[in-house]
Amino acid sequence: MNFGSQTPTIVVLKEGTDASQGKGQIISNINACVAVQEALKPTLGPLGSDILIVTSNQKTTISNDGATILKLLDVVHPAAKTLVDISRAQDAEVGDGTTSVTILAGELMKEAKPFLEEGISSHLIMKGYRKAVSLAVEKINELAVDITSEKSSGRELLERCARTAMSSKLIHNNADFFVKMCVDAVLSLDRNDLDDKLIGIKKIPGGAMEESLFINGVAFKKTFSYAGFEQQPKKFNNPKILSLNVELELKAEKDNAEVRVEHVEDYQAIVDAEWQLIFEKLRQVEETGANIVLSKLPIGDLATQFFADRNIFCAGRVSADDMNRVIQAVGGSIQSTTSDIKPEHLGTCALFEEMQIGSERYNLFQGCPQAKTCTLLLRGGAEQVIAEVERSLHDAIMIVKRALQNKLIVAGGGATEMEVSKCLRDYSKTIAGKQQMIINAFAKALEVIPRQLCENAGFDAIEILNKLRLAHSKGEKWYGVVFETENIGDNFAKFVWEPALVKINALNSATEATNLILSVDETITNKGSESANAGMMPPQGAGRGRGMPM
């Protein structure tokens, strides 16, 4: 068919599909991301505020951890979800800097917005940002100080990094207490692996935060026990510990079975055989010489009383996570049978005891020779407080872990961002054209961190930033915001330290997220189906193999 000079309209998308594109779409996405950034801004820094979030199921959370807040905010805008993803990635990779990375990404987008409105191609902005971030990372690596070259002990340096991570958290007033706990926890791990999953955290409501305990070994809540456990000893010195994955319980058969017997004696023989089987298992356990028997599966009332008569402590239904950490701490291995257990299959520790902590009883294994694991028992008034203490300790533990692995640190309090910003401004003066403006915009965006730190603390941000620019232009590379004096100062000398990895990861993630948003200029939203079952109903009469009614 001949359409002449006109091109026919071709409809590809079904009716109701929403498609928007062009410069306006990029700006709309930027506005959505900036809205998320504005929600997080007040939480940044040691004097930042906390946010109270009530979820749809009425669960209350109080936190100033960026990743936690974004996870609970239930962000629905597809572009803004990018910020949630980079915050989670930062949390998983380095543990801290989750708020900073979101604020940086939002600010980079905000700085790109005027260029887009003036008609500059988004690809030019992305090219400028990529160049700027590579220069910024190069500068941070140049600034970073190897903590092993410092005169102080390694432990003292790790404590300083942990203290900086805690400065913006709920526990900053108890930092002296929790800093030691964090460093002890990380140093108890295997130096080659540093697997933070082996640090167990148990939350016990009640008491003060400083009643929290560090156990150089394993502690777990007392499992369900049958009658007879009262007679079992609750404390051992240098016990032998047997870990099982065996059910020590006399119970009915799981499968339907039928046994035909001719005489009562035959029935009695079957019953006796069941008892003999369970007693044989119990005798084999006793012969190993173990003082403590742990099992992932239930230990029944018969076994509990059998062990109590022989001064053996037992605990069944121990979680797999706790059991694995027990093995890591006391040695030995988990046995799937009670026969042929050798002495090397048993573990040991200096002290085992069951003790009351708050309203719960806990089993504690201390002084473990193989200890590559530890447990933190956290106390606190309200559940929300303990949950926030756990999140704060997680951030500090990750920071200590990264500092131990990478050993390169920089100063916090906005000092690093100001120095990198000054370096980028100097570089931008050496080039011409649009790239100069874009790199300058990147440098300006970095100043959002010290500016927001000042605003959250109630300081005059304009005055402090002017002082910082002047100090950095004179070569004071570690000058940042000092909260005690409401002024500026050398944050490196004041031990406000952060691993360089936190800054590098935050800059890379924020720039990648910004470039991703800038590269998307079209959004297609498919119309939702009328109902969840639309198109799923069978035609009339087509069910159950019947034909159509006549």
Swiss-Prot record:
Pfam families the UniProt entry points to: Cpn60_TCP1
Cellular compartments annotated: Cytoplasm
GO molecular function: ATP binding; ATP hydrolysis activity; ATP-dependent protein folding chaperone; unfolded protein binding
Sequence segments annotated as region (Disordered): 529-550
GO cellular component, one term: chaperonin-containing T-complex
Domain of life where this protein originates: Eukaryota
Family indicated by similarity: Belongs to the TCP-1 chaperonin family.
Quaternary organization: Heterooligomeric complex of about 850 to 900 kDa that forms two stacked rings, 12 to 16 nm in diameter.
Function: Molecular chaperone; assists the folding of proteins upon ATP hydrolysis. Known to play a role, in vitro, in the folding of actin and tubulin. In yeast may play a role in mitotic spindle formation.
NCBIfam families for the chain: chap_CCT_eta (TIGR02345), thermosome_alpha (NF041082), thermosome_beta (NF041083)
Name of the molecule in the record: T-complex protein 1 subunit eta
Naturally occurring in which organism (per UniProt): Saccharomyces cerevisiae (strain ATCC 204508 / S288c) (Baker's yeast)
Gene expressing this chain: CCT7
